[in-house]
């Protein structure tokens, strides 16, 4: 009696468990569907944007798309044509205005330049003064050349005495048939010439009196004994003659020892 009751109870328990599971499953599904139904998308979310684009792609037919593309191309063409016309018009107007402005500027520059050049001219450097040559006097007497006899007598008198007194000059000019001014000027020129000659002789003597050292070479290196290079060459010195050149020999105004 106990054996048949056991399996019957187990089967009833299994059925009750399966019913409870089935009853729970639809509740869960309904809960999920309700949650999904309650879920809303924002208008700017990625899902909403993707959903709109997909709907538009599905709704638009190829014929409508072709028409829209053609209409868009026509609009673009007309836009660019109008824009090109406007750009050409604006360029022409701009070029005209630039030409007018350039003409006005050139006129203004010319006027300002003329005004500035007329009123503010650059300072001119003073030209160098021309070299003024000494001109002879118009009333100057012609130069009278001296004769040879007059020149000889003048040279002889100058060697005797370089400066003449008034009486001597008057007497000497009468003897040569010359004026006192001619004799006076000749003596002045002759003294200047004698001074120039004396200075030139002094310069020549100074140049000649400078010692001229001839280059020489040492027979052996410095610091080395002379015995290595042989005995030095000895030359006999001349013996001075007694009685000769005891006193200084004078040549003019200088003495040689």
From Swiss-Prot:
| Annotated DNA-binding residue span(s) | 139-198
Q: What does this protein do?
A: Probable morphogenetic role.
Q: Could you mention a single GO BP entry for this protein? A: regulation of neuron apoptotic process
Q: Where in the cell is it found?
A: Nucleus
Q: Which family does it belong to?
A: Belongs to the Msh homeobox family.
Q: Which organism is it from?
A: Danio rerio
Q: Which SUPFAM superfamilies match?
A: Homeodomain-like
Q: Which SMART domains match?
A: HOX
For this UniProt entry, what's an example GO CC term?
nucleus
Q: Which key words are in the record?
A: Developmental protein, DNA-binding, Homeobox, Nucleus
Q: What is this protein called?
A: Homeobox protein MSH-B
A GO molecular-function descriptor: DNA-binding transcription factor activity, RNA polymerase II-specific
Q: Where is the composition biased (Basic residues)?
A: 133-143
Name any one Pfam family assigned in the record.
Homeodomain
Region annotation Disordered: where it falls in the sequence: 1-37, 91-146
Instruction: Give residue spans, biased composition: Basic and acidic residues.
Output: 12-35
Q: Is the keyword Nucleus in the record?
A: yes
Mostly located where? nucleus
Residue ranges, compositional bias (Low complexity): 111-121
